[in-house]
């Protein structure tokens, strides 16, 4: 059964927002990367706090990610919905293999290995293990 495993939020100050999530919700910082992004987790769901770099673009939800057992089966289900994707994610985005949109244009990722596979490949080292 697919499970939501991460959310990505575009924000003006990822460090300040990470501090908020850690102090208010007891989340833990699991990674910072060179793009000024901060990743926090409650041990199950990871929230990617992404630095806003595009002038005039809104902050808010960027995408959400599902961990799935069989991405090909999900891709087959998506065909009848006439949505964009799924398309392969760039190789430097090790935490998800595919990206698609829902019928209203909201982006979502599909990952068979999720953050656990990414940690094994050298990314998201502190992210929670998959369920």
Language model segments and positions:
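Core segments of cupin and vicinal oxygen chelate
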Residues: 2, 8-47, 53
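A short beta-turn/loop motif at secondary-structure boundaries
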Residues: 33, 55-56, 89-93
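Active-site beta-strand termini and strand-to-loop segments that position acidic
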Residues: 40-43, 100-103, 113
């Amino acid at each position: 059964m697919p499970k939501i495993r991460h959310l990505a939020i575009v924000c003006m100050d990822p460090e300040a927002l990470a501090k908020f999530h850690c102090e208010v919700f007891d989340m833990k910082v699991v990674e910072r990367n060179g793009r000024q992004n901060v990743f926090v987790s409650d041990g199950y769901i990871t929230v990617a706090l992404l630095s806003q770099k595009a002038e005039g673009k809104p902050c808010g939800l960027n995408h959400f990610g599902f961990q799935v057992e069989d991405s090909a089966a999900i891709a087959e289900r998506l065909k009848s919905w006439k949505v964009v994707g799924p398309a392969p994610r760039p190789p430097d985005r090790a935490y998800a293999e595919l990206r698609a949109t829902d019928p209203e244009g909201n982006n979502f990722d599909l990952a068979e290995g999720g953050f656990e596979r990414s940690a094994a490949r050298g990314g998201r080292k502190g992210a929670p293990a998959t369920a």
